């Protein structure tokens, strides 16, 4: 099972505050474990604009018509002071990994220097922190009915209203997440 470029959709019974009603975009999944970013948990009072101001990033070619007041997401409980930028593919950044034909992840400052300019990727989602699973841990959580999985849809990552992402990701499976009982059993 390789879940790279998939969504993990928290089951209604998952009560961990970081992951309750969350959608995690899996950036990497291999024999050693998995790494992903929560895409639907905004950090209150933190926008892309505020992050750029704090880092004193102000490119000369900034286009003020570009909305930088987008919220920054909490990507997960690990390395919460590190930025991870999901974006549509655009070459030239120093620390980027292509995840799919539609998504890349970049962790280097050079991508931040393009935000709000004609040089930025077409679509972006900025997160602070990430989540990861050790070898076999994610598979175990899926077997325990903590997560639903489905192929990722970049439209949900970049365009869907944040409050709708959990429901919309589940609808990719043809289900209404609100109709799932909080406790699942095994037959």
Swiss-Prot record:
InterPro entries in UniProt: AlgH-like
Pfam families referenced in this protein's UniProt entry, alphabetically: DUF179 (PF02622)
GO cellular component: cytosol
Cross-referenced SUPFAM superfamilies: VC0467-like
Family: Belongs to the UPF0301 (AlgH) family.
The protein's name: UPF0301 protein plu1183
Species: Photorhabdus laumondii subsp. laumondii (strain DSM 15139 / CIP 105565 / TT01) (Photorhabdus luminescens subsp. laumondii)
